[in-house]
């Protein structure tokens, strides 16, 4: 990982998996110049769901959130790049797809606030990335490798 890169957690939710959007979503991040360093197709159990959404425990929508995220497989990913968390959040769009701009993932594919296709770490929550990455991935599951396109994506890299 170079000095200006950061890692961020992204998850295609059950509705995105069921609608066959994994490839489209991965392509968008790759086309942006981000590097995939971890990916895992998995079924979330209730324990992991409670850990992941712990901040919402006690809220009226919590049980529905847990039921939804455990209802079908998800595709968990770790992406790396300069300012990766903000880059990803801008590509994902607003939590409510109805408020998301066309061209964002939720603006293009999201239909419902509760089933909004994708989860991405919050860039305003310091430490959210590390917490979520550690929750879903062991360090040895993340691959650190060079990507030849870096020189063509970032101006401070040499050609």
From Swiss-Prot:
Binding site for ATP: 13, 61, 89, 95, 106, 116
Keyword Magnesium: yes
Catalysed transformations (reactions): a 2'-deoxyribonucleoside 5'-diphosphate + ATP = a 2'-deoxyribonucleoside 5'-triphosphate + ADP; a ribonucleoside 5'-diphosphate + ATP = a ribonucleoside 5'-triphosphate + ADP
GO molecular-function terms, A-Z: ATP binding; metal ion binding; nucleoside diphosphate kinase activity
Keyword presence, Signal: no
Keywords, comma-separated and alphabetical: ATP-binding, Cytoplasm, Kinase, Magnesium, Metal-binding, Nucleotide metabolism, Nucleotide-binding, Phosphoprotein, Transferase
Subcellular locations according to the entry: Cytoplasm
Cofactors required: Mg(2+)
Active site: residue positions: 119
Gene3D superfamilies, A to Z: Nucleoside diphosphate kinase-like domain
Pfam family for this entry, one: NDK
Superkingdom of the organism of origin: Archaea
Gene Ontology CC: cytoplasm
S-S bridge residues: none
Catalytic activity, EC: 2.7.4.6
A Gene Ontology BP annotation from the UniProt entry: CTP biosynthetic process
Function description: Major role in the synthesis of nucleoside triphosphates other than ATP. The ATP gamma phosphate is transferred to the NDP beta phosphate via a ping-pong mechanism, using a phosphorylated active-site intermediate.
Homology family: Belongs to the NDK family.
Name recorded for this polypeptide: Nucleoside diphosphate kinase
Taxonomic path: Archaea, Methanobacteriati, Methanobacteriota, Stenosarchaea group, Halobacteria
Gene name for this UniProt entry: ndk
């Amino acid at each position: 990982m170079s000095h200006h890169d950061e890692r961020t957690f992204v998850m295609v939710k059950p509705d995105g998996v069921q609608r066959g959007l994994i490839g489209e979503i991965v392509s968008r991040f790759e086309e942006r110049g981000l590097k995939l360093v971890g990916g895992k197709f998995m079924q979330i159990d209730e324990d992991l769901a409670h850990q992941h959404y712990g901040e919402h425990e006690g809220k009226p929508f919590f049980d529905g959130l847990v039921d939804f995220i455990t209802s079908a497989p998800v595709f968990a990913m770790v992406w790396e790049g300069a300012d990766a968390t903000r880059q990803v959040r801008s590509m994902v769009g607003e939590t409510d797809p109805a408020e998301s701009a066309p061209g964002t993932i939720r603006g293009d594919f999201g239909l419902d606030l509760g089933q909004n296709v994708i989860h991405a770490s919050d860039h305003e929550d310091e430490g959210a990335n590390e917490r979520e990455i550690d929750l879903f991935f062991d360090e040895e599951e993340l691959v650190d490798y060079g990507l030849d396109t870096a020189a063509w994506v970032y101006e401070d890299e040499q050609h």
